[in-house]
Amino acid sequence: MTPTSLARARPTSSHRWVPAAAGWIVGVIATLSLLASVSPLVRSLIRVPREWVDDYIFNFPDTSFAWAFVLALLAAALAARKRIAWWILVGYMIAAAGWNIAGLAEGRERWFAEVGEVIGLAFHLAAIAFLLLARKEFWARVRRGALLKAAATLVASMAVGTLIGWGLLELFPGSLARSDRFLYALNRVSAFAGADAASFSGHPHVFVNALLGLFGAVALMVTAIVLFQSQRADNALTGEDESAIRGLLELYGKNDSLGYFATRRDKAVVFAPSGRAAITYRVEVGVCLASGDPVGDPRSWPQAIDAWLKLCQAYGWAPGVMGASAAGAQAFREAGLNALQLGDEAILHPEDFRLSGPDMRAVRQAVTRARRAGATVRIRRHRELPADEMAAVIERADAWRDTDDERGFSMALGRLGDPADGDCLLVEAVQADQVVAMLSLVPWGGNGVSLDLMRRSPQSPNGTIELMVSELCMQSEDIGITRISLNFAMFRSAFEQGAQLGAGPVARLWRWLLVFFSRWWQLETLYRSNMKYQPEWVPRYACYDDARLVPRVGVASVIAEGFLVLPFSRRHEQPHTGHHIAAPGTLVATGLLHSDGTAPDGMGLQADLADDDQPRLPEQVRVRMAKLKALQAQGVDAYPVANPPSHTVAQALAAEDGADVAVAGRVLRSRDYGGVLFAQLRDWSGETQLVLDNSLLADGSTADFTRTIDLGDLIEVTGTMGRSRSGKWSLLVSGWRLIGKCLRPLPDKWKGLTDQEARVRARYVDLAVNTDARELIRARSAVLHAIRETLVAKDFLEVETPILQQIHGGANARPFLTHINAYDLDLYLRIAPELYLKRLCVGGVERVFELGRAFRNEGVDFSHNPEFTLLEAYQAHADYHVWIDGCRELIQNAAQAANGAQVFMRPRADGVLEPVDISGPWTVKTVHGAVSEALGEQIGPDTDLATLRLLCDRAGIPYLTHWDAGAVVLELYEHLVEDQTREPTFYKDFPTSVSPLTRPHRSIPGVAERWDLVAWGVELGTAYSELTDPVEQRRRLQEQSLLAAGGDPEAMELDEDFLQAMEYAMPPTGGLGMGVDRVVMLITGRSIRETLPFPLAKPR
């Protein structure tokens, strides 16, 4: 059981059945009374038992609509455990028991009358006993209402009904004596036929008798309506409540497209105790119907839901929710309710909206018709309209309300022209200077709108609504809108599934029923009016407590949504009618809420709610934030403008004794010895000791430093270089200034961040405290700089080519897919810059390179990252042999720049890194030769596929049956050679079939002029003698494109632009590709994630 459901639960009792039983008994009498008032047959059938019950048990007149209505209300109240119903029933039972006692005391001549009185008395005493024992089961209260107004209405209605009934009796008296006619009318209309008919001389016609009871029932109904309406109005939103809701919407309104409808003034509201969330609701037929998601901070939704459920229990209401989002429905489910998908909300994203395409043909044609008819669209905020124009808007909305062409929606604000709604958007269609249609949309956060009202003139041209929606999407960028909600269409999935080909009989029947009821209610209209815009459908849910209450919740929803309008119902209150502020007293006490319902001071409310957040923060953070506030109150700017220091820490340490310096950095450690304080200060260049002595400080004391500065703070200090009393070279501080307050504590000053995942996620903290992390950043920068210097020294040009590409090519890898809204075009993040660099080669750039980012949607491990730095370089009139020396030189120079020597750092068995010399030439082997060494059997380019498969089987290496010989050799190479390689080795002459962009070997058939550089099981780079034959290039890429079309996600697509460029002839060229991240990894001896400043991390 959830905490909320535990809060709602009451102790079980042996008398829990009493309210339901009492309700059922009274309800049966009410039903029989109503049927007897309508049907003479029923009246005749139950005459004998009715008369006995009426005489000894319970008032049960032969015909009385008024009494049937009273009993129906009482039965419903008893079943809902209303305390006032308990009092009424107990009082009636005591009065009835007294009547029987009085009868027995008088004595009766007929024995069966005495028996009846005894039985009736026993029943009354038993009923009173059970009701008294079950008193605590009737806990539900009744909302406050205008009792005096209701009582006056009852008296006046009864008086009018009695007079009219008296008049009817004078006109149609039947056998009723003249002297009894007024009293008879009074008895039937106002006294619920409490006096027996035998007490009067004669009786009127049965039809007149029924009319008299109906007059009483109408009087009671009018009174009930007045009372219920006063209850709703009296408990509806106050100005302060609406102001609080608007404040929550300003902070959290972006979460819910229907959130603004919570400001409707015919709803009531209940807040979480903190005031950070609220639920608006309305009570219909005993159901407390919450409208959509709670408003406010999602973290406070459980508290708001708990307060709402407690309210439902206190008043005996059945809880229900209408139109909750998936997040809201989940929150209600966690509170113990059940969820049922009600429909789908139609969301338009203007950046994706296009009138082109076959799916939008109907909308496009409608828009064209409206434009041809001369319709134009103007869009304004409500606050931009003068008072006279807004009055005209309201008048048009009322005039067009009942037209056959009206397209209303179920979720509506129900008011126009209120100053508090100035941010609402008005879209008008104008024809010949006359407004012919309009839309009103309410805010959805800061960049969205939700449809509230849709009206059109009967004379508006066809397609006007489509024109307004389309123009709103087209002009959305100018008015700052990125989301448009058309509200939700109920039972959308039923309409869609029932219309599909092959739909089952149940789905078709369900759709037929919905279409049938759409004649009266806008069910299909809502669906079709949204569907044609091709929106995103977002599900909305209804929530309920018990499956048995689903019908009641459904009826309440139908009434609340306006599909069923009750007599004399008042909807969409314009003014604030509530008299009881529901907002928490702490929130009201801030003075930020406005009694007119306008939004509170946003920054003030945000600051107030932020104060409530403080207990959620760790204690050290709260202490530091309190210190920050104290400093700001003293006028200290904890984040001042820059004042460049005169020295770095390294320069200060190298300065002469007594030199004046000003440095800035982060405080890492601090030791206070009273009048003298020592602190460690670090900047990027190094770390030094600060000595703060009260005798040396120009202003303030060490105590001021201790009160103000925490570990991790950024400070600026001035002073002279010298030695401490212990002889340590230090900065003797004469003045200091805080330049950045650190609000979160640093990790352990000796160990730092020990968790690798934490080091990745908080790299900034790792850099602040870990010198190794800083050294890796420096080494990576040195590697990149050395690579550039080496290539530029050889007259290579550095260029930049597109990262967003329409065709993924240049390597066999799975790409990342993205989309450009401006052109409605799918694009790829490049997997390699090769094809664009070769275009430059065709254009005459003979030596070119690019050092940039590439992206491959593949695995993540110690040597792979989806986003990586890639070097590609091309040299005309060269081949892959040239790049053997060129690649080795690049890596050796990079190692020299990072480590000070041509070495790789490799871990020993104990994990300690040691240098491994990589100077001089590196080993070169052929692929087939290396595989032959590993297998112990000779293979070559001419080895047949069957033999290669047999060798794989012997070595336990898996392969796919559709692979050719080249692919099998590559698999043998990767398992037996690449993974086992230690010192840097070049493996050359790969099979042609696995090298689609490489020229065939000049003398050896079946292999291509390509090499891979491998070191310690990691592929560092590859080089080709590039394939320059455009005809052969096209054939190979067509083979690749067939693989891609067949479902291979790594196969390259056919790039016609590249092939056309190649047909202009590219000179013989050697190309190099090198993974820079892997080079840095081997040079530093760390994993890729450690060498990258910000590697990709999985979501928390």
Curated annotation (Swiss-Prot):
DNA-binding region: 661-739
Cofactor note: Binds 3 Mg(2+) ions per subunit.
Membrane topology value: Multi-pass membrane protein
Subcellular localization: Cell membrane
Keywords of the record: Aminoacyl-tRNA synthetase, Antibiotic resistance, ATP-binding, Cell membrane, DNA-binding, Ligase, Lipid metabolism, Magnesium, Membrane, Metal-binding, Multifunctional enzyme, Nucleotide-binding, Transferase, Transmembrane, Transmembrane helix
NCBIfam families listed in its UniProt record: lysS_bact (TIGR00499), PRK00484.1 (NF001756), PRK02983.1 (NF002821)
Similarity annotation: In the N-terminal section; belongs to the LPG synthetase family.
Name the record gives this protein: Lysylphosphatidylglycerol biosynthesis bifunctional protein LysX
